[in-house]
């Protein structure tokens, strides 16, 4: 008699095909094309209406954004296609615990506006490396971070979002992967290069609306298919692949699938790690990452920046319902594909022997939605991908131009800075295209967990340096640099070990070293943060005290101090001006950049005749916001946000709203704990 527990025989290939000959209907294609045209029109509209011929106008949207586009851009910059694919995939695989990242981010984005942003505004900084330059002096720390920021985003967030978007585009449209990605990058780079941050923020606002509409529609279809939340809870634990081995635990739903807080030793996300290990990388992302902070600095004043953070915080409640729960529904509806447990079968289903949970969201879209709505959700995924790409392109360009290039060429003219910023965006596009083969080879069973583990190895040291610099006046350059380098080295060692000793599949023994196998990445984040903090504290305590100029208006406790009238550290950023105690600007901080621009302009027009230009050159200069007839030296340089003053009534309303938002988050933590 044959054993009933033998290895399962794969069913016919057509039953295993995750996307069985699904193709977009003409109506879907029309919706997608209309979306592309609409986004491009909005991007070009913002390009025409905004001031792009200055460094501040291009990199900080002129500093006149109101709260709602700032909030929408914060949310869209955070929630890329990796969220849709990754959160839904992790929900299908392990349940709702992954939503802890979103609820944790809710607190962090509020801390940005209420705690960290006032320090940045008081210090008159436009980039995060610039803050560290003014806070600690020297060039070691800002140059180190200015080098890390673009590479970190390009090789992690950019990589994941491109792969996630490629899953959707390639399988639904049956396009060549390179063709799909190159097309997206081309459109994205066009309005990023042309319009700067203003174009990015306006298109982010549009894409946030599209993402939310599409995601709400799919959530409704998903819950209707399983009978609501009660049906989801009843059926999720029965969602098993029919071809799994009966004597194997692989592919079984977790018993704690509907709980966020899980066992501290044996679970996939231990609760101490969620509370503490997750918080430090979250603070890095929301409070010190250039992509996020740059959007808040583009607000017209502190109240609008707070309003934007509040809007983003409320929206951070939604991913649990819009992405995680639909991913769990997908496992119920398509268990043989989404919940496949045998490596050979998974390889045939999605070309990934580790598991196919990451196809959960695309599977719902392509199988559940009717014609037309399917095209809308394609637009949603494209919107999510393009939002992330524009955020990375613009912010990486800002850091390279304002911190690295300006350090190399301190007398660079404003025109040169504008050209360098745009060329760097094009260079990132080229790197992104060349990175596609690596994206294809790096797909894992849970995409979202992949990026979070990498973040836990690289971000805590940077976050600790910012925290110590903002809240302990005794922190000096030697302590911060020592802690930063030690932390980054330890994180790189763990990262390399993770790549060398790959996590085995469910049906394989785990022979990895104990430091990799037994130390969860969130626990390692706690260890790394503690080590960095102790190093910064110890070295700073036993070395010289920072000068007053490196502390005044650059910490939480000194943000209201009057500006030093002499012996102050000269700002190296061409946007900086001195701000008086009452918030008015003074002319003492004008950068050498203006002198260079004025000198060049005077020389070019000394004979009273403007040089002739070809029509092609004129078009290119207009696209980049650098028309020849606009080469006039500005009469003054406007600061980003010049005052910490707020209207008392508005401040009270914002504070009350902040308390309400935090209360909602605490309720959700408790309800799903």
UniProtKB/Swiss-Prot annotation:
The keyword Ion transport applies. The chain crosses the membrane at residues 28-48, 57-77, 79-99, 103-123, 181-201, 209-229, 273-293, 309-329, 376-396, 419-439, 447-467, 480-500, 522-542, 653-673. It is found in: Membrane; Apical cell membrane. GO terms for biological process: apoptotic process; myo-inositol transport. Keywords: Apoptosis, Cell membrane, Ion transport, Membrane, Sodium, Sodium transport, Sugar transport, Symport, Transmembrane, Transmembrane helix, Transport. Expressed in kidney and small intestine. It is a multi-pass membrane protein. It comes from the Eukaryota. Residues 1-27, 78, 124-180, 230-272, 330-375, 440-446, 501-521 are extracellular. It holds the Pfam family SSF. GO terms for molecular function: D-glucose:sodium symporter activity; myo-inositol transmembrane transporter activity. MI transport activity inhibited by D-chiro-inositol (DCI), phlorizin (Pz) and sodium (Na(+)). Insulin increases D-chiro-inositol uptake. Residues 49-56, 100-102, 202-208, 294-308, 397-418, 468-479, 543-652 are cytoplasmic. It catalyses: myo-inositol(out) + 2 Na(+)(out) = myo-inositol(in) + 2 Na(+)(in); 1D-chiro-inositol(out) + 2 Na(+)(out) = 1D-chiro-inositol(in) + 2 Na(+)(in); D-glucose(out) + 2 Na(+)(out) = D-glucose(in) + 2 Na(+)(in); D-xylose(out) + 2 Na(+)(out) = D-xylose(in) + 2 Na(+)(in). GO terms for cellular component: apical plasma membrane; plasma membrane. Its main location: membrane. InterPro entries: Na/Glc_symporter_sf (IPR038377), Na/solute_symporter (IPR001734). Disulfide bonds: none annotated. Involved in the sodium-dependent cotransport of myo-inositol (MI) with a Na(+):MI stoichiometry of 2:1. Exclusively responsible for apical MI transport and absorption in intestine. Can also transport D-chiro-inositol (DCI) but not L-fucose. Exhibits stereospecific cotransport of both D-glucose and D-xylose. May induce apoptosis through the TNF-alpha, PDCD1 pathway. May play a role in the regulation of MI concentration in serum, involving reabsorption in at least the proximal tubule of the kidney. NCBIfam families: sss. Belongs to the sodium:solute symporter (SSF) (TC 2.A.21) family. This is Sodium/myo-inositol cotransporter 2.
